[in-house]
Amino acid sequence: MTQHFIVIGNPIAHSKSPEIHTLFGTQAGLDICYQRQYCPDDAASFTAVIEAFFHGGGVGANVTVPFKQIAYECCAARGGLSEHAKVAGAVNTLLLNKALLAKGVPPVEALFGDNTDGQGLVNHMQRLGWPLNGARVAIIGAGGAARGVVLPLIEAGIETLSIANRTVSKAEILVDELSTASEKINQHTIQTYATADLSGDFDIIINATSIGLSGETLPLTDKLNCQYAYDMMYGRELPFLQHFSIRGAQTSDGYGMLIGQAALSFERWTGRAIDVAQATTALENVST
């Protein structure tokens, strides 16, 4: 029997998720149908699309911009949230709470939300061989992308964490909110800086902003150094990575994170683990 999945967003035509998950299905030996689903940008439309999909037998859905917070609110009022979703304040993976289904709760009232973005980032760094345990890490950006990766990084054993943002007050607010949301984070001291004031030696620096996609550059000082630089964006030459590459750092964009978070979603839905390295090679061969 074919298992049905969707990715919901606006815009959505650019999404690589159908190709990625179709490959996962082939690797796992499962008959799946994964489609893009456009949705008008409002909560009522999102709820209607989700309810129709799961009422019709859908197995799982991915959620992308601008609906991750709406999905969070929807699941919080229904089937629940994972710890990572609670801390991130956003949901990128929808599935059904089997315990509630077993009690006779209708599928649309058993929606459960997870967030696999941060773990996808951590898993990609681990596949690259980047040392996270004991690492000194800095994140540039204090928006939703940064929020979603803090807990997985701490769970991976990093030693210190600094968060920098053009407006330092936004970084301070983020740290306060994260510390309130998670005892694991509350036990970890996080330093905050204005991006232009971030300096010193770090093992890993992560760009969690989209500035590079617009051709802008971050106000990085020459006194800021790292061994590894990671940009969560992908798909073009990124000034952030160029800045650190010429200074001798190993660099990576976020394409591996995209595949990693997708693999985790697929495993949540189907119970099948994906060989991400094999899948990445296959996808790279298809795109070249």
UniProtKB/Swiss-Prot annotation:
Gene label: aroE
Q: Which GO terms describe its biological process?
A: amino acid biosynthetic process; aromatic amino acid family biosynthetic process; chorismate biosynthetic process; shikimate metabolic process
- Its EC number is 1.1.1.25
Keyword check for Isomerase, yes or no: no
UniProt KW keywords: Amino-acid biosynthesis, Aromatic amino acid biosynthesis, NADP, Oxidoreductase
Residues bound to NADP(+) are 83, 141-145, 165-170, 232, 254
The pathway that the record names for this protein is: Metabolic intermediate biosynthesis; chorismate biosynthesis; chorismate from D-erythrose 4-phosphate and phosphoenolpyruvate: step 4/7
Sequence positions that bind shikimate = 15-17, 64, 92, 117, 234
Species the sequence originates in:
Psychrobacter cryohalolentis (strain ATCC BAA-1226 / DSM 17306 / VKM B-2378 / K5)
Q: What does this protein do?
A: Involved in the biosynthesis of the chorismate, which leads to the biosynthesis of aromatic amino acids. Catalyzes the reversible NADPH linked reduction of 3-dehydroshikimate (DHSA) to yield shikimate (SA).
Going by the entry's taxonomy, the superkingdom of the source organism is recorded as Bacteria
Reactions accelerated catalytically: shikimate + NADP(+) = 3-dehydroshikimate + NADPH + H(+)
Active-site residues annotated for this sequence? 68 (proton acceptor)
According to the record's subunit comment, the protein's assembly and interactions are:
Homodimer.
**Per the record, a Pfam family?**
SDH_C
Q: In its keyword annotation, does this UniProt entry include Amino-acid biosynthesis? A: yes
Name the UniProt record assigns to this protein: Shikimate dehydrogenase (NADP(+))
Q: What class of enzyme is it?
A: oxidoreductase
Q: Name one GO molecular function term.
A: shikimate 3-dehydrogenase (NADP+) activity
